[in-house]
């Protein structure tokens, strides 16, 4: 796409702003294949831009969510964003073709009945209305993206606050010494400071920019999480079993986000496991590309019809007892964190036999590994 066109077709210049893991998905591949078709009727020039390498494009084109496809020429500029770019494009290409025919005739011609009932001006007004509707849909997508970021950060704030409160209670009861108390409070304050920065960036950033992937020892992270939750399980005689091989490879992930996923899953398991029950944390090196992590409990289980819904935004299942509050925003946050890392998350459960939540994380491949490479390998994006 982009060379001189022997058929003399009008040039259509497009800019696709997308991260590498977006380009590996079927949605954007379908967009590219569609633009390569002869019946599109244009000489298409498609430029690709990675927002992590060219962040100025987000401000220039007022983009909050990616991927986004931008029509640069012919004017007017249009922006298509969200999960249905191909459908939007198919609706607009015929109109662009018609606009090209009309402009080729020259604007000095008197308005004519192009389709037997509507004049050129009426068609132009209709196109302007459709542009406004499309911009409104894009704005709604941006608002939803910001809402998801806010829910994630707000939900994550609970963890350091709860840990600080438990540490204060333990210190007052003489269960921990002053040195450990100060260490816990210092770490929790650092976490809250980082979260406050996330909140300040919610209105201007993308979801992916809140992640800092690095070489990570997931076994050590899980040990810290279990220790942090000990006040919740020791007093109830709940046994936490771990099955983590000593040769488990390091993963390529954001430490804060992986800790958040493990905390959410273990907290949910503790909520639904009765006194005297057990929880199992397992980590397996399934392939050369990923580590598989499972958190299984001996609770009441999850109804089959609810097992897909629990990972959706704004879904909270009814509580099963006075002690539980239902699966809520935490699982949708877990799903998004795992997917940004290039993995997936699912649950296996039978009523009365507990629930087992499993997610995958990419393995650290070496110093040259880039963010998004794991997603290209897995090829598993949002369902």
Swiss-Prot record:
InterPro entries: HATPase_C_sf, His_kinase_dom, HisK_dim/P_dom, HisK_dim/P_sf, KaiB_domain, Kinase_SasA, Light-responsive_reg, Sig_transdc_His_kin-like_C. It comes from the Bacteria. GO terms for biological process: circadian rhythm; osmosensory signaling via phosphorelay pathway. One of its GO terms (molecular function) is ATP binding. SUPFAM superfamilies: ATPase domain of HSP90 chaperone/DNA topoisomerase II/histidine kinase (SSF55874), Homodimeric domain of signal transducing histidine kinase (SSF47384), Thioredoxin-like (SSF52833). Residues 152-365 form the Histidine kinase domain. Keywords: ATP-binding, Biological rhythms, Kinase, Nucleotide-binding, Phosphoprotein, Transferase, Two-component regulatory system. It catalyses: ATP + protein L-histidine = ADP + protein N-phospho-L-histidine. Pfam families: HATPase_c, HisKA, KaiB. Its EC number is 2.7.13.3. The modification Phosphohistidine is found at residue 155. Homooligomerizes. Interacts with KaiC. Participates in the KaiABC clock complex, whose core is composed of a KaiC homohexamer, 6 KaiB and up to 6 KaiA dimers. SasA and KaiB(fs) compete to bind to KaiC. The N-terminus interacts with KaiC, while the C-terminal histidine kinase domain autophosphorylates and is probably responsible for self-oligomerization. The N-terminal domain stimulates the C-terminus to autophosphorylate. Member of the two-component regulatory system SasA/RpaA involved in genome-wide circadian gene expression. One of several clock output pathways. Participates in the Kai clock protein complex, the main circadian regulator in cyanobacteria, via its interaction with KaiC. KaiC enhances the autophosphorylation activity of SasA, which then transfers its phosphate group to RpaA to activate it. In addition to its output function, recruits fold-shifted KaiB (KaiB(fs)) to KaiC to cooperatively form the KaiB(6):KaiC(6) complex (independent of SasA kinase activity). This is Adaptive-response sensory kinase SasA.
């Amino acid at each position: 796409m982009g060379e001189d066109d022997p058929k003399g077709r009008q040039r259509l210049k497009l800019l696709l702003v997308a991260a590498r893991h977006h380009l590996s998905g079927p949605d954007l591949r379908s967009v590219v294949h569609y633009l390569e078709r002869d019946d599109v009727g244009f000489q298409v020039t498609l430029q690709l831009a990675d927002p992590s390498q060219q962040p100025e494009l987000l401000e220039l084109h007022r983009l909050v969510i990616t991927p986004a496809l931008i029509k640069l020429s012919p004017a007017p500029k249009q922006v298509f964003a969200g999960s249905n770019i191909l459908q939007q494009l198919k609706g607009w290409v015929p109109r662009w073709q018609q606009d090209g025919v009309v402009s080729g005739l020259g604007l000095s011609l008197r308005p004519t009945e192009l389709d037997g009932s509507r004049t050129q001006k009426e068609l132009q007004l209709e196109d302007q209305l459709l542009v406004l509707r499309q911009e409104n849909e894009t704005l709604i997508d941006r608002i939803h993206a910001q809402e998801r970021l806010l829910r994630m950060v707000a939900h994550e704030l609970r963890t350091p606050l709860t840990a600080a409160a438990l540490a204060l209670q333990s210190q007052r009861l003489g269960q921990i010494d002053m040195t450990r108390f100060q260490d816990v409070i210092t770490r929790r304050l650092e976490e809250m400071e980082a979260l406050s920065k996330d909140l300040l960036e919610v209105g201007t950033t993308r979801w992916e920019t809140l992640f800092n992937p690095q070489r990570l020892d997931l076994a050590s992270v899980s040990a810290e999480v279990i220790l942090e939750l000990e006040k919740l399980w020791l007093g109830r005689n709940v046994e936490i079993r771990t099955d983590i091989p000593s040769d488990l490879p390091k993963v390529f992930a954001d430490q804060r986000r992986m800790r958040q996923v493990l905390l959410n899953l273990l907290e949910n398991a503790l909520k639904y496991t009765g006194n005297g029950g057990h929880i199992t944390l397992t980590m397996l090196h399934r392939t050369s590309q990923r580590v598989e992590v499972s958190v299984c409990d001996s609770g009441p289980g999850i109804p089959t019809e609810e097992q897909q819904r629990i990972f959706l935004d704004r879904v909270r299942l009814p509580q099963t007892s006075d002690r539980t509050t239902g699966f809520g925003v935490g699982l949708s946050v877990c799903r998004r964190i795992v997917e940004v890392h290039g993995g997936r998350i699912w649950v296996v459960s039978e009523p009365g036999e507990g629930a087992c939540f499993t997610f995958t994380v990419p393995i650290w491949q070496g110093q040259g590994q880039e963010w998004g490479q794991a997603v290209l390998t897995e090829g598993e994006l949002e369902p």
